[in-house]
Amino acid sequence: MFIIKSMLYRLMQMIVVLFVISTLTFILMKLSPGNPVDKILHLDVAQVSTEQINATKDKLGLNDSLLVQWWHWMNHLLHFNLGKSFESKEPVTQILFNYAPITLLISFSTLVVSLCISIPLGIIAAKRFHKWTDKVIRVISTLSISLPAFFIGIILLFIVTNLMNIDSVILSQFILPVITLSLGMCAYIIRLVRSNLLMLLQSNIVQASRLRGMNERYILIHDLLKPTILPIIPLLGISLGSLIGGTVVIENLFDIPGIGYLLMDSIKSRDYPVIQGCVLFIGFFVVIINTIADLLTLLLDPKQRLQLGNPKIKTNTPLISESSDRHA
């Protein structure tokens, strides 16, 4: 019952967030400098008659008041109609379907690679606390967090194209972007796994298992793995949402025909429907992914369900920031 209430609450929250995103995007597009009519006519304003400009504006509905334009936009949105591109005249939904797969592929591949690398490294760092292995992993994690993704991408491009003289579409448009995005994501997960595991190694349940003669491998798999990984789920939701939104820079850097590339191209041409569609796509996936992450945490963590059923109950689950500061 509490889970159903939580799902309904998240659904209402998602609707409100998407409404705010769509409205803010509409307002920002109307306040931004430039005129899409100039781009559509592909002519200098001095060479186009006023009648042609007004006819084009009437056709696009740009002569209506802002309130009327907003109402038409929201009405179409409720019917899952994002309009047509000013440039290509294609439906925006079709354009998004053409560009979205590569963005989603890179984002989810980055997530898988990050998990496969960061969880083992976080466990190794915790098990070898304050040894040279732990110190090396911490230094690499700190560097990965400190360096911007676009800077890492530029370095990788320079190494592959200039120093190694490798010309491969798969390498430049898939493997390198995944590596670039994975480095920063791995760093956060490694630090979280390490700090959670260090804290759990001092818990009573671990001490009791050791007294019963259980080996360290058994303790890690049966006693520590689930409580270590559970706090990662909310972070994964935030990180994956950020990945989809953050591909704008990476896709333009590596010349990848994804949503980020489409968004930048549409901004240059003042293609309002496509811009609004891209922003809504990114916002929708960010909200959906975070909602799924919250529900998974609720389903897998009994403490969260207990606290949801009785808000007066306070769980003893430590905050991520506190545990990170304690074992950093």
UniProtKB/Swiss-Prot annotation:
The keyword Ion transport applies. Keywords: Cell membrane, Ion transport, Membrane, Nickel, Nickel transport, Transmembrane, Transmembrane helix, Transport. The complex is composed of two ATP-binding proteins (NikD and NikE), two transmembrane proteins (NikB and NikC) and a solute-binding protein (NikA). The chain crosses the membrane at residues 11-31, 104-124, 139-159, 170-190, 229-249, 279-299. This is Nickel import system permease protein NikB. Pfam families: BPD_transp_1 (PF00528), BPD_transp_1_N (PF19300). One of its GO terms (cellular component) is plasma membrane. PANTHER family: DIPEPTIDE TRANSPORT SYSTEM PERMEASE PROTEIN DPPB-RELATED. The gene is nikB. Disruption phenotype: Deletion of the nikBCDE operon strongly reduces nickel transport and urease activity. Mutant shows decreased virulence in a mouse model of ascending UTI. Belongs to the binding-protein-dependent transport system permease family. OppBC subfamily. Part of the ABC transporter complex NikABCDE (Opp2) involved in nickel import. Probably responsible for the translocation of the substrate across the membrane. Required for full urease activity and plays a significant role in the virulence of S.aureus during urinary tract infection (UTI).
